[in-house]
Regions:
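N-terminal accessory interaction module
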Residues: 7-81
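Walker A/P-loop nucleotide-binding motif
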Residues: 109-129
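Loop/turn-to-beta-strand initiation segments
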Residues: 170-174, 220-229
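AAA+/P-loop NTPase substrate/partner-engagement loops
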Residues: 137-172, 180-185
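A short helix-turn-beta junction within AAA+ P-loop NTPase domains corresponding to the substrate/partner-engaging
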Residues: 242-263
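N-terminal pre-Walker A segment at the start of P-loop NTPase domains
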Residues: 77-110
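Conserved AAA+ ATPase small/helical "lid" subdomain
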Residues: 268-269, 274-338
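Conserved catalytic/switch belt of AAA+ P-loop NTPases
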Residues: 184-224, 233
Length: 339
């Protein structure tokens, strides 16, 4: 935002920006100016800071315009304040999950060597990744391919070394789901840094004698050609610990970082409604009225729930199947904080 006196804003007189495939007229809107008019391969544009206004990408964007006369410099007006509509929030989050699927495909193919997926618990991060990998594994199993593996919980450095060795080939993927402790262990982090190095040849070494390696037939060095996905509830930008932040920065520099942009309770609730509308509860064979009642229960009681998540919706749906006449009372005692 433009609180500093030296920051220039620009008021768009005539200009458009493509949002989800549609040219949106931005006439009258005020943005922080990044770079004045230029002509590119697709015509003229002025570059502004899209992150300053809700509903626009969190980066610099190019607004299409015919000439410098299509906008005016404005040091007096404030940046336009917009609040995202529910539809815009759902579209934004849906776009991120579509990107997550595309990036997971690229990881599986070995085109992308590593990805970090960041988002709050219970919004479908793991499901989005595993759904894609399961589809590829069904095809690869016909040709004798090796399945990917999801690693959860704590892991020692030597355990990590052995796991990487077992999934070292190009078409293999290791998914580290909620394994944040591995980021804090210096030796484990150094192993990951070697595995995800940007060099064409990535060689990992274990430089101390180990009975475990000898016993499992694992060499003390090997070339790693596989890929890795890290699924975490951490938002790397919010980490306060300097030590952990430096560790995460070292990992982030070697990975693509996918932030699912679910930051608020409203974002999370709209994500839950979107996934439910897409058919998440169909397997429970509940009629539409009961499904709507389940969602109303979640929405009304969202501040009292033990966890506002897709998992909680599924728990309540299970109760609606098991106890058709008293599922709400059961849910009040199992998924809500007791007073």
């Amino acid at each position: 935002m433009n609180e500093g006196s030296n920051m220039k804003n620009v008021k768009i007189l005539e200009g458009t920006y493509k949002i989800r495939g549609k040219d949106v007229d931005l006439s009258g809107m005020v943005f922080p100016l990044v770079q004045e008019f230029k002509v590119g391969a697709k015509g003229g544009y002025v570059t502004v800071d899209g992150a300053a206004i809700a509903g626009f990408p969190d980066r610099n964007i190019k607004i299409a315009c015919d000439s410098p006369r299509s906008y005016e410099l404005d040091t007096k007006s404030n940046v336009t304040q917009l609040e995202e509509t529910d539809e815009q929030i759902v579209d934004r989050i849906r776009d991120r999950f579509d990107m997550l699927k595309d990036m997971t495909k690229a990881v599986k193919k070995g085109v992308v060597s590593a990805m970090i997926v960041s988002g709050p618990p219970g919004v479908g991060k793991s499901h989005g990744v595993e759904e894609v990998l399961d589809r590829y594994d069904t095809l690869s199993s016909l040709g004798g391919g090796t399945k990917y593996e999801v690693v959860k919980g704590a892991m020692s450095p030597i355990g990590l070394y052995c796991k990487l060795f077992n999934f070292k080939e190009k078409d293999q993927v290791l998914v580290f789901d909620d394994c944040d402790a591995v980021f804090e262990e210096p030796l484990a982090l150094n192993i990951l840094k070697a595995a995800l190095d940007s060099k064409k040849k990535r060689t990992i070494h274990w430089n101390t004698d180990s009975f475990k390696l000898r016993n499992e037939g694992v060499p003390d060095s090997f070339e790693f050609k596989g890929s890795a996905i890290f699924i975490t509830n951490l938002d790397f930008r919010d980490i306060k610990s300097k030590k952990l932040r430096s560790h995460l920065e070292a990992l982030e520099s070697r990975c693509h970082y996918m932030d699912l942009t679910i930051k608020s309770e409203k974002d999370k609730m709209l994500r839950i409604k979107q996934v439910t509308a897409d058919g998440m509860l169909d397997a429970y064979k509940l009629d539409d009225e009961v499904k709507a009642d389940v969602m109303d229960f979640i929405d009304i009681n969202k501040k009292q729930l033990r966890e506002l998540s897709l998992r909680t919706v599924l728990k309540v749906a299970e109760l609606a199947v098991a106890f058709p006449d008293r599922w709400e009372a059961m849910a009040e005692n199992t998924v809500m904080h007791t007073r």
